[in-house]
């Protein structure tokens, strides 16, 4: 176990780096929002019964509803070597494709059990993809929780998609990277069109056949901060990233769109004229919620990699006092624009040593703690209001029109705690 602190400077707040006991969900939870986003994709987890229970309970979907995800259970006979796992997987995939001809994109999703037994799903996916003539397209990625966070499931999924994207050639385009709700995509598309960016694509697209092309004339901007591997893969295809804060809250959304506009040489006056009204509406809608949050102390446990953009939004637009902002990984190249907007000397922590972080949290007695489900109930029992960080990934929180909804996600636990204390 090691702890080190980076000295403060004009550009970087103190950072506590810790490695110890962790409490996290695995990347399989990403299937919940990814299968809603890509509407003709199927996610086949190769794992244990525990994996199956996790995904089904997180999605809240009954098996008889025939959802677009399932689990190929690794049984004891598989672990004992009495069955050929490749043959078993081929049989399951063949049966699935015969039963669900509507599937256009099939992901084989690795898990902790499949990684422990060294099952090579990437090779299996390539073999099956060729066998079925790419109808459907078959890819693989890891949703394992071994040394990862739950949002890395989306990163791994999109990273697997990037090599399959068509070559854009000389076409100039903007690619928005990261799964967002359909309503958010529609809002962003209208705004980008209004400011004069003609070609806007989203990764992932709503349908497998609509995935964007990529090439040297592609500029991409991240909608989610946890997509480091996807960003690297896009760079390898020749695309260039537009650095910007993330589109959370009125300020973040405005700066995000302005960064894209500047990268495409759009007249700032035109951008301002398009954004003025939605930005003003968002700010006005935030006013009532700000009154409930201003002056409240909030502590972030590291869980989703959304912590720093959320902290920026809460501090600058809601008047919240940041006690500590923990994040599983601090990718400075993806976070520089956000770090510059945080209040000076905001206490950041990278990595997790849960016992030490709990000690710091209890000592500060914050009004609200943002954490994973495993910590929420014990903290609630101690009288500390909590917000599940995973809800912030499941909910539409990006863009101007969702700014007040995002703030309300933090205000509601405080209101509930106040009612319970009466």
UniProtKB/Swiss-Prot annotation:
Protochlorophyllide reductase is composed of three subunits; BchL, BchN and BchB. Forms a heterotetramer of two BchB and two BchN subunits. Belongs to the BchN/ChlN family. Its cofactor is [4Fe-4S] cluster. Binds 1 [4Fe-4S] cluster per heterodimer. The cluster is bound at the heterodimer interface by residues from both subunits. PANTHER family: LIGHT-INDEPENDENT PROTOCHLOROPHYLLIDE REDUCTASE SUBUNIT N. Pathway: Porphyrin-containing compound metabolism; bacteriochlorophyll biosynthesis (light-independent). Its EC number is 1.3.7.7. One of its GO terms (biological process) is light-independent bacteriochlorophyll biosynthetic process. It comes from the Bacteria. This is Light-independent protochlorophyllide reductase subunit N. Pfam families: Oxidored_nitro. It catalyses: chlorophyllide a + oxidized 2[4Fe-4S]-[ferredoxin] + 2 ADP + 2 phosphate = protochlorophyllide a + reduced 2[4Fe-4S]-[ferredoxin] + 2 ATP + 2 H2O. [4Fe-4S] cluster binds at residues 26, 51, 112. Gene3D superfamilies: Nitrogenase molybdenum iron protein domain. Signal peptide: none annotated. Keywords: 4Fe-4S, ATP-binding, Bacteriochlorophyll biosynthesis, Chlorophyll biosynthesis, Iron, Iron-sulfur, Metal-binding, Nucleotide-binding, Oxidoreductase, Photosynthesis. Component of the dark-operative protochlorophyllide reductase (DPOR) that uses Mg-ATP and reduced ferredoxin to reduce ring D of protochlorophyllide (Pchlide) to form chlorophyllide a (Chlide). This reaction is light-independent. The NB-protein (BchN-BchB) is the catalytic component of the complex. GO terms for molecular function: 4 iron, 4 sulfur cluster binding; ATP binding; metal ion binding; oxidoreductase activity, acting on iron-sulfur proteins as donors; oxidoreductase activity, acting on the CH-CH group of donors, iron-sulfur protein as acceptor. InterPro entries: LIPOR_BchN/ChlN (IPR050293), Nase/OxRdtase_comp1 (IPR000510), Protochl_reductN (IPR005970).
């Amino acid at each position: 176990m090691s702890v080190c602190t980076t000295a403060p400077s004009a550009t970087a707040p103190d950072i506590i780096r810790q490695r110890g006991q962790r409490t996290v969900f695995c990347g399989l939870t990403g299937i919940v929002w990814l299968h809603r986003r890509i509407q003709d994709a199927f996610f086949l987890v190769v794992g244990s019964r525990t994996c199956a229970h996790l995904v089904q309970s997180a999605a809240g979907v009954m098996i008889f509803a025939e959802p677009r995800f399932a689990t190929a259970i690794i049984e004891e006979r598989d672990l004992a070597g009495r069955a050929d796992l490749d043959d078993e997987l081929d049989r399951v995939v063949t049966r699935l494709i015969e039963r669900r001809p509507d599937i256009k994109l099939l992901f084989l999703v690795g898990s902790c059990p499949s990684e422990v037994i060294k099952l090579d799903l990437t090779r299996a996916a390539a073999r099956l993809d060729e066998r079925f003539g790419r109808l459907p397209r078959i890819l693989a990625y890891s949703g394992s929780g071994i040394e990862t966070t739950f949002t890395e499931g989306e990163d791994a999924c999109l990273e697997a998609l990037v090599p399959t994207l068509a070559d854009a050639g000389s076409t100039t385009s903007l690619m928005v990277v990261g799964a967002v709700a359909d309503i958010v995509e529609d809002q962003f598309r209208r705004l980008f069109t209004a400011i004069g960016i003609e070609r806007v694509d989203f990764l992932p697209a709503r349908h497998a056949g609509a995935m964007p092309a990529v090439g040297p004339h592609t500029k991409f901007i991240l909608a989610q901060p946890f997509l480091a591997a996807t960003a690297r893969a896009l760079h390898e295809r020749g695309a260039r990233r537009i650095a910007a804060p993330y589109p959370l809250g009125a300020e973040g959304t405005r700066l995000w769109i302005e960064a894209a506009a500047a990268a495409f040489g759009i007249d700032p006056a035109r951008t301002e004229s398009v954004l003025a009204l939605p930005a003003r509406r968002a700010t006005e809608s935030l006013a009532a919620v700000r009154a409930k949050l201003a002056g409240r102390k909030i502590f972030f446990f590291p869980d989703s990699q959304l912590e720093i953009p959320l902290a920026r939004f809460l501090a600058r637009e809601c008047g919240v006092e940041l006690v500590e902002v923990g994040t599983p990984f601090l990718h400075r190249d993806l976070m520089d624009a956000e770090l510059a907007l945080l209040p000076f000397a905001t206490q950041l922590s990278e990595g997790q040593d849960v016992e030490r972080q709990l000690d710091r949290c209890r000592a500060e007695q914050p009004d609200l703690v943002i954490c994973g489900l495993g910590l929420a109930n014990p903290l609630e029992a101690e009288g500390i209001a909590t917000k599940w960080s995973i809800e912030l990934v499941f909910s539409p929180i990006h863009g101007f029109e969702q700014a007040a909804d995002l703030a309300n996600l933090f205000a509601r636990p405080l209101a509930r705690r106040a009612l319970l204390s009466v």
